Design a protein with these regions (language model features):
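Short flanking/linker segments adjacent to small metal-binding domains or redox-active Cys/His motifs
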Residues: 59-93
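Charged, amphipathic alpha-helical linkers/stalks
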Residues: 34-69
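Histidine-centered nuclease catalytic patch
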Residues: 1-22, 30-42
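The canonical Cys-X-X-Cys-His
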Residues: 26
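Generic serine detector
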Residues: 16, 21, 52, 81, ...
Length: 93
């Protein structure tokens, strides 16, 4: 039996059109994390710098989910490497 997939906007609809396909449980988990982000991720007309920060944060969330599902520490390291860029993008605005 195939799992049903849903499209997930990695940075929220207001910040990017980039999407990935996720199974429903993974989409729900990622969305729960996304809802804890800086409230500006829900705003329209964010600056490009802020949008890029949320894109990086979305990629980080995907990498962390992959780490949890596979126990492959490489994904954790990749996610961790994005923290500086995310912080710089979100704090500078």
């Amino acid at each position: 039996m195939r799992k049903r997939l849903e499209l997930h906007h990695i940075a929220g609809r207001n910040n990017s059109e980039m999407t990935v396909s996720l199974c429903v449980p993974c989409h729900n988990e990622i969305t729960r994390h996304q809802n804890t982000w800086d409230i500006r991720w829900t705003h329209e007309n964010n600056t490009e710098t802020l949008q890029n920060g949320f894109i990086m944060q979305g990629i980080r969330e995907l990498l962390l989910l992959k780490y949890v599902k596979t126990c492959d520490y490489t994904y954790y390291c990749l996610a961790d490497s994005l923290c500086y860029g995310i912080g710089k993008s979100l704090v500078s605005e």
